[in-house]
């Protein structure tokens, strides 16, 4: 979740970890399980609430069964929320300001990764939850998210405990919110969150609406666990363990930040392409369609990147840690760009309007540390102002035609 700042210390941490690993012989023991058991595992006794995000299209197709617009033929409005740690304050502000403008859509599909996962339930439910969304990103402080000694954490499972983040999520995600998401799910809308199963090295797509509508007594607990897991950077935070069972064998799955696998889950590429029904033409195996048939023309794809995408020139200091941090930041931008480009190509091919917003280089406020509240307030205000006056959406990836 807080990768941008943690990257500054990644090289130092790696060096110390290599030294300490030999000493850390008291690691927590885990119940072994097999890959075959994982394929059939049911999380916390609640079946039918997830799939591999990189699964074949024929499998992903089931996740959009009974999606409202697919049944009525109406245009689809989709929102994808990226990772970005404390930079999520930008997306939160934009959504709140967009509500105030009176033009924010009622999204049919919302996806969230990492910090985008934390805000996704509120984005999905609309303006009546804007107060919670604002509180989440304007009242957050270092101590409300981080606890523990990072040096002692080198001998554990993460530099920091997820306990404070769990408390933050529990304070905002309650049974009423779960019930509202369940109602939206039954009305044909979909909310998805990505975590990374570290044992499998694969991204997991959680159908949060199906989970909310399951009626299972542990649904709220699992819902919260998924949000925390998606925002828990591996190594920085303890992983989130999710109880699972397969053929009578009980074990714990290890889940971490969804951004480990995907910085952004682009719905059109992995889900809508799977339906084979968006334009009424299914031409081949796995429901793939012929290009250019664009059935739901008029639909909208909105992508909010809680980060900056534009290159920012700076003479890099010739020091190991500065070089590592600069390289990591470059890698993150490149990863975002590739995903955005895929989304744009899909939208153009299928007749959707592509809409992109991200933090501009003109934003010059600097963060002075992890979870800098003043910095987050400035980012929230930036996004909020954009939303109120009318978001100037970019309809192509940056630098594509210039």
Regions found by a protein language model. Give the residues of each.
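Hydrolases whose catalytic domains are alpha/beta-hydrolase-1, hotdog thioesterase
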Residues: 119-122
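Active-site loop->helix "elbow" adjoining a glycine-rich segment at hydrolase catalytic centers
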Residues: 114-115
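N-terminal signal peptide c-region/cleavage motif recognized by signal peptidases
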Residues: 19-22
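Bacterial N-terminal signal peptides that target proteins for export
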Residues: 2-13
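Patatin-like phospholipase
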Residues: 25-109, 124-402
